[in-house]
């Protein structure tokens, strides 16, 4: 059993607290109150609890989420936004629980990105309790065109109500009616789900009081920072604002327009405040995952300790099919097995006979970039099960536990590559540092440091004595380099004005093939203007590593030859044997270049294999759509001096370590082919159906949290993280992870942590939410 990683170990005390019932539950969201009860969302469902705290009672349970619950003025009914049938609609349910009734039926927009929030978001009720107030996209293309609507409750339980009625404001985000129902306080902007803390700019919402009778609108907050979540309580407008750096409660006197700060939180935002009604002087909100209520008269805050007896159905361990979640793949020597990294696990699949093997079974780690050793006995891969990405080794049968090979690395790692003798592994990181790792000892040494990006095309010579790769040269173009292990020397082997990448050694160690941007093959475009389109300019080239080598494709000439004498046996070729490193004549190497006779094109992959070259050709690149030509995989034979297409629609491929077979990916199909001119025939399709991977959200959620934290640490555009203590922010938000019961809550925690960096367009999206299928509805285009 692997040791608990240090970042995960920090969560164990909190996990222990959660396990001891009754304990306070956190991540209670979107609260509302009436009388002596609060309603809120936890784990995607609605719950009700006493205002004084205690144990919550479940109100809803569905595959989708239920959000934005609002008590009716009499407290008997709760309106909410729900996904009961797949898309977001407005529902009502008794405050004691029971069957929910659907009020809206117009097809909602979605699923929307997290930063957009939800369609048909409920905001409250009309003061007389006859209709529900909500915001909808039904007449808008984007969120900046939303409107507020009311929809009346039907007279009978099984009767459908009237159609929604739009309020007269042309665009609107959050809103609430005045106590007499004659005016509305609202925000014309909606960006309540965008993770922009302390934002100042054109998208900072202000609050307006609108009078439908006169059409007059008055800005009552008028500040450069965010003013949101309006509540109309007697003669004051209450709202949330981050004017002091953190969202707090503020209020505005409607008579003299004076504004005052009501709460003083400096660590956690006051989020989604909601009042008990226009005559109730209490406001409930979430802060740090907990619920609090504020007495508007005494101006005092009261914490609410609530225990949610959630059965944890959404975080139970299950087995899922990961065949559609393949992240990386490789082929074994001889092509008899393939290794896949899918949904964080390392699995091997037979070409034809045998079982599927999950070698890591690690729902709490992200395992990726798995590759077979040259002898097929081990598999190297990258994993963060120690808390940072390191190189790990596992037996190809999975009979022994995985072994951590490297220690102390602190950056995202890319694909490792084995030396042919199995003694070394080369691996680079996001900083462009290329290292060699001794397989026996785990010791590391730096080979190169790319200062302008990543270094990911490193390849080994067949003798294991040299490593070739491309990195930025003095002219800011990619240049080929060769590193010699014997004397630890690094040689640039490209011309200064060449743009070369994708090197690959031939099996004899005599040549280094590569892709070079050395041609110019413009096409004319005449559809809108007479202009040049310059693509298809990459060629395939070869460098002769020794001065005495003949051309790879010598000039052919027909000559009369005599058969070999009987006492002179025909030479037998058993393939190259390397007892010592191959010799490379670096003097003049950049000039010993030969172009392989394949046309200039858009190439995206090159490997020396068999008696020739394997390469992938793709179509032209277009803005906003896929290429008009499918990517194809080809093999060029040196002996036959011709090329044959092996597959079409190829999204990727992986060559076996011995170069005899190739794993080809075409869409969701995987096939193994021999690397020959006739490799198109006899391809064997792999069966990935039902690829079994354990799903254990209780372990996956902490891993996702810490990996997201590392991604920002590694890739944020300035090293000082905008001056914030990024480690301290992880410590602040990590305890919330043990309370996550739904993937949307994990996204919320991640978004809040990242928002602390005070940067725009840094969003969290996606994830396995388990949302039900959305209904398909056709609209006639009529109103």
Task: List each language-model region with its residue ranges.
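Beta-strand-rich domains and repeat architectures in extracellular enzymes and scaffolds
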Residues: 24-49, 325-347, 597-618
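Hydrophobic h-region of N-terminal signal peptides that target proteins for export
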Residues: 15-23
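Blade-terminus and WD-like Trp-Asp/Gly-His loop motifs, strongest in beta-propeller folds
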Residues: 32-35, 69-77, 123-131, 175-183, ...
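Flexible, low-complexity junctional segments that flank or bridge functional domains
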Residues: 155, 404-407, 422, 620-622, ...
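A flexible loop/linker signature enriched in serine peptidases of the S9 family
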Residues: 41-47, 61-66, 79-95, 99-120, ...
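Long hydrophobic segments that form regular secondary structure
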Residues: 332, 588-644, 727, 731, ...
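A short helix->beta-strand "capping" segment at the edge of beta-propeller domains
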Residues: 24-28, 54-56, 310-326, 582-599
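Conserved blade-ending motifs and adjacent loop-strand segments that build the rim/top face
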Residues: 260-274, 491-502, 600-604, 642-653
